[in-house]
Amino acid sequence: MASNMLQLSLPPLSSSSSSLPFLSSSVYVLPFTHQRRHFSFFNVQNYRFRLSRSTSLGPLFVNKEEDSATYAVTEEEEDNDDDDPDPQSLEYVSQIKRVLELLKRNRDMLFGEVKLTIMIEDPRDVERRRLLGIDDENAPTRDDLAAALEEINEGKVPKDFAALQMLAEEMNSWPNLEVEATKQNKPGRSLYAKATDTGIDPKEAAKRLKIDWDSAAEIDESAESDEPDVPPALGYGALYLVSAFPIIIGISVVLILFYNSLQ
């Protein structure tokens, strides 16, 4: 078995190639096969060349400093993109903020009410787009519009330009945006108070309506100055008379029967 083995010595590795793997032994054993007659010095040299070439290829190293620098540059570019929004986006944001301010001043609408209104979609518009065949599946949804409105309320510029544009168009088309809401009139007498003569206690009215004492006093004065709906000539006498008819008829029947029994 020892006669069938050939030992080859490899040249020592250079100390400059520090990245090459360390070889524990410089001797490799080549087994002989049954085709011994074809073995030659040229074959040994070829095998030795291939072996040395395979061992000379060290592991592939990645420069971590270059990768970290490239990643940092990419993050800086993204931050610059976020810090420099599109001028058209800034214009849409200013329009939406203006509409929100008008709704709060003229309609007394809070931000939650405006957001809820934006999230509700008109079924007529959905049916119209479906019939006309202009319904786009990739168009921004109502949730996207509400998210964009939430970002604008927080002082941010939405990144979704399509949702921002659609939101600005809807906010600008809000009906009667410049018209102020009509103010409520002073509280007057209720229908129950007008139908009864119990009157209104100013203190109780001030507590229930949460108004000042002067306003409650005005309600009491108006209650006293109003004319009654029922004329004083009739009053409740007609009601008592109608209610007494059954009693009068019953007493008359009893008297007639008693008179007939005496005869």
Curated annotation (Swiss-Prot):
Signal peptide extent: none
Instruction: Work out whether the entry's keyword set contains Lipoprotein.
Output: no
* Transit peptide per record: 1-71
GO terms for biological process, alphabetical: photosystem I assembly; response to photooxidative stress
The protein's matches in InterPro entries, at most eight in alphabetical order, are given as: CEST/Y3IP1 (IPR040340)
Instruction: Tell me what topology the record assigns in the membrane.
Output: Single-pass membrane protein
Q: Which GO terms describe its cellular component?
A: chloroplast thylakoid membrane
Its keywords, alphabetically, are: Chaperone, Chloroplast, Membrane, Plastid, Thylakoid, Transit peptide, Transmembrane, Transmembrane helix
Record localization? Plastid, Chloroplast thylakoid membrane
Q: Main role?
A: Nuclear genome-encoded factor that participates in photosystem I (PSI) biogenesis. Cooperates with the plastid genome-encoded protein PSI assembly Ycf3 in the assembly of stable PSI units in the thylakoid membrane.
One further remark on this entry is:
Plants silencing Y3IP1 can grow only on sterile sucrose-containing medium and show a light-green phenotype, very slow growth and delayed development.
Tell me its family: Belongs to the Y3IP1/CEST family.
Q: In its UniProt entry, what is this protein called?
A: Ycf3-interacting protein 1, chloroplastic
